[in-house]
């Protein structure tokens, strides 16, 4: 099942959520650490908490996953980060 950005339901996404999704699409199958995501999306100068990545991943999953309890697109790599699951 191959999907791209255009096949997802059209639900309003924030620029940050779109940037995260784009990062995953540019790195298919590669596990990205929370730090990788934070640096790529928020920039090196961001001085906030790493938890902001988890919060935005959760919001993105609500919009694209059929079952957020068992995600198929954005999967968790425990103790590391996240991976685009397709």
Give, region by region, the residue ranges found by the protein language model.
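Short, small-residue-biased leader/transition segments that mark boundaries at the very start
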Residues: 1-13
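Positively charged, aromatic-enriched patches within helix-turn-helix-type DNA-binding elements
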Residues: 11-12, 18-80
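Conserved active-site beta-strand element of glycosyltransferases/polysaccharide synthases
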Residues: 82-85
